[in-house]
Each structure stands twice: as structure tokens, then as C-alpha cells.
Amino acid sequence: MKKIIILCFLFYACGTGDRSTMNSVHLKTDATTDSIEHVVKEMLLAISTNDLAKAKYHVLEEGRVFRVRNDGMSFRSNSEFFKQTGDQTTDYFERMWDPIIMYRGDLAVAWTTYDFHLNGKFSHCGAESFTLTRVDGRWMVMDWAYTANEPENCNSPLGPIVN
């Protein structure tokens, strides 16, 4: 619960406050936003290719994954997520587009829309947010949250999967 409150505060703090100090929040693309986006994409690609060692490299073990659906919210630790993902033979594939990345110092947020496929078939889409921090000079995902909408509410600009 404490992490949820902190995460909500961070999102609130990024959107409010004295605008004269907000010029240090970066919304345009630069080397830092590119490196943050790269970490998120690498993590998702590693999950999609079942390379859990590579995925774990980009994620803090102590963090959490939150799923928000019409029937409520659930969460689990990053460790639990990787254990469950590694124990399955399901083929995952996720694509993201139009990420919005903000950072200040060693804290960053990446917000994106995505679609998700299981065993080569479209499953769902939604919005996904990642909270990252810089640890020993490299960006790592602390927590991430996503909505999981039913297929009829999805409009991916990426078209069908090309194998």
C-alpha cells in the first residue's frame, strides 16, 4: 500500500507545482529519454523472447507489477512475476508505441500504449507506466502498472504481427 501511495504522489508531483521549477522536467527527446525508452523496450523484448535473465537485468527485484482491469487491481512482486512467467510455456509478445518519458535527476516515468499477444494471437491492449531509477549509472525499472482492456477496445496503429 505504501508503494501505491508513493507512486500516486510521484505522478501527482510531476503534474503540479510551481511551473517555474518545472523546466527541469524533460519532455523532449534527448540521450536520457532515449536510454530510458531503450531499457523499457529491452525489458519487454526479453520477456517476449523468454530471456528472463536479460529481463531481470533491467528490473529491481524489490519492485512490483500492478494490473488494473474492470474487475479490480492486482499486484505481485517483480520476483513473483518472473517466477510465474518463467514457469509457463506461453509465447508472449508485447508492442508499445508513442511513449511519453519524463525524468528529473535519477527518477523517471515512462507512459505508453501497448498491445499484447499470447501464442501468436491478439489478447488485449491498454496503457502501461514504468517507474525507473538510476542505479550505479544505469536505468532500472522499479515498478510498472498496466491496464488490460478487452480486444474490442483496442486500436493499435502497428497492424498485425509480422512473423
Enumerate the language-model features and the residues they cover.
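Short beta-strand edge/turn micro-motifs at domain boundaries
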Residues: 19-20, 127-155
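Short, low-complexity N-terminal intrinsically disordered segments enriched in polar/charged residues
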Residues: 14-49, 53, 57, 161-162
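Short solvent-exposed beta->alpha transition segments
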Residues: 38, 56-94
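Sec-dependent N-terminal signal peptides
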Residues: 3-12
